[in-house]
Amino acid sequence: MAGLSLQHPWAFAFGLLGNLISFTTYLAPIPTFYRIYKSKSTEGFQSVPYVVALFSAMLWIFYALIKSNEALLITINAAGCVIETIYIVMYLAYAPKKAKVFTTKILLLLNVGVFGVILLLTLLLSHGEQRVVSLGWVCVAFSVSVFVAPLSIIKRVIQSRSVEYMPFSLSLTLTLSAVVWFLYGLLIKDKYVALPNILGFTFGVVQMGLYVFYMNATPVAGEGKEGKGKLAAAEELPVVVNVGKLAAATPDRSTGAVHVHPVPRSCAAEAAAAEPEVLVDIPPPPPPRAVEVAAV
């Protein structure tokens, strides 16, 4: 790192800044996992983003070790490995059995199987600079696939006309991170670091543009918070139950209150005919908890 800071002071500065921004991005899911810890349930959250983030960090550490003199890449991705591992362990601790099995399979397939194959092929089939080239393009391909993932969120925002699925702060952070790491890769002449971040910057700008365009738009009925609000309002309509046929009502002359007393079935019809209907406003059960899907 000392050599990098002396020979490429600007590269060192951007790399250090990239470490700080990326670290804050790694910490973004903390509120989600605090909620999981408090409720002792994963509440429908998915584990795939954290498994993929762990795989990405492992891949970039391997690349940095093969290339050498890439301490800044190692530090941030090592931190990422630790943080994502903690997230995954917490997820497995509180997830239902089906989600645990699925997460374990994905971990074994991607982080053990695929990573193991990449490691062996890189070490056995290539040598010297060719290792850096081969592994570099693997990192580029995987990073591009990760950056393309937000397309589903972009589609959802356009269809629902609601930005609740795409926080502006996260889009801004990811865009800044892409800019900083692109400049870092450009300054150290590493196209494998720079190229994926061009796409990352592009998607980040598109997301922020969509946020500005739709932040005051009226969500499509049944979508977004407004649609959910209408559904919740419908669920909160009072349930009116006619108890006239089930009980007899007698007024309390001292207070004027009406007391409802159960009567035998044999007298139910007579009570219904003799007494007026008594309407009881019973509040409905609370609406189901909204399921929040977490994204990195």
UniProtKB/Swiss-Prot annotation:
Single annotated GO MF: sugar transmembrane transporter activity
Inducing stimuli: By the X.oryzae pv. oryzae (Xoo) transcription activator-like effector (TALe) proteins (artificial TAL effectors).
Bilayer topology: Multi-pass membrane protein
GO biological process: carbohydrate transport
Gene, per the UniProt record: SWEET13
Keyword Cell membrane part of the UniProt annotation: yes
Assembly with partners or alone: Forms homooligomers and/or heterooligomers.
Role of this protein: Mediates both low-affinity uptake and efflux of sugar across the plasma membrane.
Protein name: Bidirectional sugar transporter SWEET13
